Amino acid sequence: MTEHPDLPRLQRRLAEFAAARDWGRYHTPKNLASALSVESSELVEIFQWLTPEESARVMSDPATAHRVRDEVADVLAYLLQFCAVLDIDPLTALSEKIDRNEHRFPAPED
């Protein structure tokens, strides 16, 4: 049985994968942001012409579910590589953004 992946291990694997192929020179913030946008668009494409009801059931079709998981993985991989290049801790960035949003958009009081 494989271990449950954790973020630092996945980040190391991505860095090692790119380094082994000498891709580091291509991993500029601009290129990674562009690749992230392309992969996000590929995820959107899966849902483009689906009704809301169809989109809610997308994971019930094994072939489509596989495509969705692959695109999610691509988006996450490029986002993590982008963060590594710019020395951004993605979990800290997310936590800080949630804090700002909680202040900016307070929950209604009952």
Model-flagged regions — what are they?
Residues 1-110:
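Flexible "arm" and connector segments at domain edges
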